[in-house]
Amino acid sequence: MRMLMAGLLMMASLFVNAQDEYPKPSKESLDYNVYRTKVSVPPYGLAKVKAMIAKLTPNDEEIEKLPDNLYNSLSLREKFTYNMIHGEIYSQNCDPMPPVEDEHKKIFAQLPGAFDEYSWSDKQTQFFDNNRDSVIALIKESVTRSKRVGVNYKEAIVSMNAVEIIPFLEEVYLRDKKDHDILTVFLLLMKANKYQPFLASSSFKKLYGDDANYGTHIVYNSANEQLILQRVNDFYKNYKR
């Protein structure tokens, strides 16, 4: 028992020391983290959908799934709301992510997760694929109204491989150039479609090479921004669905 307690105390000490070694981001960096991890909440049947979600309890596999009869009773727009605010599958990340310094000065290789330790089920991603045109239209409608693209919308766009939304996203990005994760969406779309000029670039090797990880990034500056926009526009012009 004493050995167990000593081991636990040592682990706790190591954890505290590791926390002390974490960087201490600026307020601007922390504010940007809040901005980039914000989920867009659609208004369609929102109160009804939230009430349904509030009654869910995880099953033995930690899945919080709306029963099929209730899910099928929802309209398309209500299903859109449900899927955009609720991930059904539990996927715990055991490794805590340390704070990121100067997060607002980076273009990341990957998007942050929309639902913490949960993610979309196959049923939910299938909804996006089966109703692709409607989902894209609803995302555009919501973004036009709110003037922002939530991380859940970005994840859905990448999941659907929605290349056709590139011009719209670029227009949104150029309004204030604040949301650098829109540039990440462009990178992920080019990667998913194996766009050779991008795959052959040094930035691709840096972002998605053998040494890449969840936090891999390139510096946000005018040169990198313009290069991504130029490449994604060339990709879009030559894309054949």
What are the roles of these predicted feature ranges?
Residues 166, 183-186:
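Short amphipathic alpha-helical surface patches that serve as generic macromolecular interface elements
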Residues 1-28:
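Bacterial Sec-dependent N-terminal signal peptides
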Residues 138-142, 156, 168-176:
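Alpha-solenoid HEAT/Armadillo-like helical repeat scaffolds in large eukaryotic proteins
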Residues 154, 186-187:
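Hydrophobic core positions within HEAT/HEAT-like alpha-solenoid repeats
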Residues 148-159, 163-165:
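Core of folded catalytic or high-affinity ligand/protein-binding domains
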Residues 19-152, 191-241:
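Extended repeat-based scaffolds of very large eukaryotic assembly and lipid-transport proteins
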